[in-house]
From Swiss-Prot:
One of its GO terms (molecular function) is RNA binding. Residues 459-507 are annotated as: Interaction with the nucleocapsid (N-RNA). Residues 137-160 have a biased composition (Acidic residues). The lineage of its organism: Viruses, Riboviria, Orthornavirae, Negarnaviricota, Haploviricotina. One of its GO terms (biological process) is viral genome replication. It comes from Rinderpest virus (strain Kabete O). Phosphorylation on serines by host CK2 is necessary for the formation of viral factories. This is Phosphoprotein.
Length: 507
């Protein structure tokens, strides 16, 4: 309901802005009004006759709402009274249109939409809205005579906000109570309307739904409203509100006497309090702590306080649960990251194992083709261990027959050889190797792994330069020795320089 009311308010404001931006000619307004009066005369004649009889009984005339004030035009809302009543309305409207120097007006047909969203077509079915395009405070809007039949508001249903339904035909209607009329509604009034609607929804919803409390308003005291429905012996149903008083003390305010008579049976007013111009403040009941409070105000405030406390506690519980979920999520993410790192380490270990398996297979393949070297050859003849006999039964490491390698290098196989002395177990094998397999003795006059013998080659000079650079001598002496090495010519001089260098390094 609140959304529909806000929709109508927005539509009304758009209509007012359009009328202010593009005012019509007064002649066009007069012609449109005359056409509207002629169209609505025949349809409202029967209903207005019954309204006149009821108005005579109540001693009231057709309702007209004057709007007089500074900066406003005096305009009346007159329902069609037949052939005689329409002339008075035409005269007043003609006088209002004649004053074109002060105000400019226009008539616009406001399209009415029912609750299903369907548009009501036709001039007769629409609300004829007369809008004054003057100042903002002086804008008054009213509808035509056919609005009670084609309006989108059902007068038989009670208003959820608690306001009485309007009888568009015979009873005086306030423009503020019509949902289809266009009004200038301020932002504060819209906010109050939304607050009342949300408060009613909060009272009717189940307790499981989390409802945010409305914004507190200091202008209007909060009170629990209860709709009242009872018969009034007429076609419509009276709808009102019953609210508990939030006042803690004082007197009943005097109310102005209404100028309109009752439209139905009289109601008893025996319990109404008389007005008072002056009253002394009342004291509430004192509590044990010494503070003065009111039982009524406490009964009104305590439900709201309890609701606020419950809402606050629920919000705190939700925040705590969300924080715990966040902490658990962080722990899970940390463990997942550790699992990812472990997976990488496992993959690297598997790769290393596969590499080691390949290396072991390669080594096994190499060992299958390697034989043990026979010791005793390639030695210096002057070495005392040079005459040691070689074991002829030496076997290879892997996959070789007994004596296979030795039989290939010996002049005679070991099985065919016989020992000279039958009493000796050893088999003499010296000089039995083939000549091509025997190692040559080391020459003392040439360079080998055991000594360096310089000659006139470039390699010998490079070796001597390396010896000088790697020595512990000073830089000056190194430079001096390098210069001497460059000046030496011949192998003999180079050998003498090498001997001198060895002596210098030993000292």
């Amino acid at each position: 309901m609140a959304e529909e009311q806000a929709y109508h308010v927005n539509k009304g404001l758009e209509c007012i802005k359009a009328l202010r931006a593009r005012p019509l000619d007064p002649l066009v307004v007069e012609e449109a009004l005359a056409a509207w009066v002629e169209t609505s005369e025949g349809q409202t004649l029967d209903r207005m006759s019954s309204d006149e009889a009821e108005a005579d009984h109540q001693d009231i005339s057709k309702p007209c709402f004057p709007a007089a004030g500074p900066g406003k035009s005096s305009m009346s809302r007159c329902h069609d009274q037949g052939l005689g009543g329409s002339n008075s309305c035409d005269e007043e409207l003609g006088a209002f249109i004649g004053d074109s120097s002060m105000h400019s007006t226009e008539v616009q047909h406001y399209h009415v939409y029912d609750h299903s969203g369907e548009k009501v077509e036709g001039v007769e079915d629409a609300d004829s809205i007369l809008v004054q395009s003057g100042a903002d405070d002086g804008v008054e809007v009213w509808g035509g005579d056919e609005e009670s039949e084609n309006s989108d508001v059902d007068s038989g249903e009670p208003d959820p906000e608690g306001s009485a339904p309007a009888d568009w035909g015979s009873s005086p209607i306030s423009p503020a109570t019509r949902a289809s009329d266009v009004e200038t509604v301020e932002g504060d009034e819209i906010q109050k309307l939304l607050e009342d609607q949300s408060r009613i929804r909060k009272m009717t919803k189940a307790g499981k739904t989390l409802v945010v409390p409305p914004i507190p308003s200091q202008e209007r005291p909060t009170a629990s409203e209860k709709p009242i429905k009872k018969g009034t012996d007429v076609k419509s149903t009276s709808s009102g509100t019953m609210a508990e008083s939030s006042s803690t003390g004082g007197a009943t305010r005097p109310a102005l006497k209404s100028q309109w008579g009752p439209s139905g049976p009289n109601a008893s007013a025996e319990n109404a309090l008389a007005s008072a111009s002056n009253v002394s403040p009342t004291q509430g009941s004192k509590t044990e702590s010494g503070t003065t409070t009111s039982r009524i105000s406490q009964s009104n405030i305590e439900p709201e306080d309890d609701y606020d406390d419950e809402l606050f506690s629920d919000i705190q519980d939700i925040k705590t649960a969300l924080a715990k979920l966040h902490d658990d999520q962080q722990i899970i993410i940390t463990r997942l990251e550790s699992l990812v790192s472990l997976k990488g380490e496992i993959d690297s270990i598997k790769k290393q194992i596969s590499k080691q398996n390949i290396s072991i297979s390669t080594i096994e393949g190499h060992l299958s083709s390697v034989m043990i070297a026979i010791p005793g050859f390639g030695k210096d003849p002057n070495d005392p261990t040079a005459d040691v006999d070689i074991n002829p039964d030496l076997r290879p490491i892997i996959g070789r027959d007994s004596g296979r390698a030795l039989a290939e290098v010996l002049k005679k196989p070991a099985s065919e050889r016989q020992s000279k002395d039958t009493g000796k177990l050893g088999i003499e094998s010296k000089g039995l190797l083939k000549k091509e397999f025997q190692l040559k003795p080391i020459e003392k006059k040439s360079s080998s792994a055991i000594r360096f013998v310089p000659d006139g080659s470039v390699a010998s000079r490079s070796v001597i330069r390396s010896i000088i650079k790697s020595s512990h001598l000073g830089e000056d002496r190194k430079d001096y020795l390098m210069s001497l090495l460059n000046d030496i010519q011949g192998s003999k001089d180079l050998a003498q320089f090498h001997q001198m260098l060895v002596k210098i390094l030993k000292n």
